[in-house]
Amino acid sequence: MDCSCVSDLLFAPPALPALWTPGFAFPDWAYKPESSPGSRQIQLWHFILELLQKEEYQGVIAWQGDYGEFVIKDPDEVARLWGIRKCKPHMNYDKLSRALRYYYNKRILHKTKGKRFTYKFNFSKVVLVNYPLLDMAAAATGSPLLLTPSPFGGAPGPDAPPLTPETLQTLFSAPRLGEPGARTPLFTSETDKLRLDSPFPFLGSGATSYSKPPGLLGPYGRAFPEYPWNFNPYLTGPFPKLPPSLYPPHFYPNPLASSLGHLPSSGAGGGPTATPLLASTGEGLGPERPSGLAAAPRLALPGAGGPEAALGGKEDSDSELEITDVSGCSSDSEGDEGLPAPPKAKAGKGGTGS
């Protein structure tokens, strides 16, 4: 059924407080066309703003304290009016307060600590839009703008566009794609020109949604000096092109160095190198042999001498090669190393039997 019980709220001329006008709303995600006053789909914070505009409800809900702060003087009456508007006769303040807590996370409003039934709108999120009551406020005050500080921290330049509701709406809210009949965006995409004209042109170049507000970013007309690292950070491109010397080593890995690291080398490291490998086989030992390889293991046959004898006697021996470390061994006949053992024992054994 249709609920037009409080429709007279919409047609009475609004009472304008001294510090604000009713032509404001919040970001695009909170403002919907079907949430306009007079609609059953209105949101609770819109309804609260409507009540705050009416002098006849000053005993029910009213502004007080800091800018944007209001107090609900009669919670049951506010809940009853909200139930009439939403066609919910069983509405009470407990349900209404739960709906208000939903806006805490959205940062539309928050509860004032230490004050009962007192809330405060977060006007840092407020943007001007074509609110239905804006025309009435403009006719009554001559200006549709809120009496708030400029969001740009100062007066606009001479070539800046006039501050209109559409201007601030475009500044503070992202464009919604796919909406039929959407407003013409205030900013036009001039990414290349913006990159050259803005103070930080190296921050990006391919962002199609990044646009330049006319009259807000002036040309950066000074000549940039020469830099000691021989590059200009204001070059065009998606990212600044710094020289490799300014980056950490992992940005520019050396593939040649990484591939050579797996090859054996004759460095001072403690790993196996090519020279010890040759030293262990007795080949390639020249005058450049390091002194630390004097005690390297050698290949030797049982009863044979140095590496020459070991390599020469390999064909005549049926036994397998044994790796023998003779560096620490001592012998009485060290000078006769490499000579076969004299057949003394064999001759003595035969002599005893004869």
Swiss-Prot record:
Q: Which InterPro entries does the annotation name?
A: Ets_dom, ETS_fam, WH-like_DNA-bd_sf, WH_DNA-bd_sf
List the SUPFAM superfamilies hit by this protein, alphabetically.
Winged helix' DNA-binding domain
Region described as Disordered: spans on this chain: 263-354
Alphabetical GO biological process terms:
cell differentiation; regulation of transcription by RNA polymerase II
Q: Which Pfam families match?
A: Ets
Q: Name one GO cellular component term.
A: nucleus
Judging by the UniProt lineage, the source's domain of life is Eukaryota
Listed Low complexity bias regions: 290-312
Q: Name one GO molecular function term.
A: DNA-binding transcription factor activity, RNA polymerase II-specific
Q: Which UniProt keywords apply?
A: DNA-binding, Nucleus, Transcription, Transcription regulation
* Protein name, UniProt field: ETS domain-containing transcription factor ERF-like
In which organism is this protein found? Homo sapiens
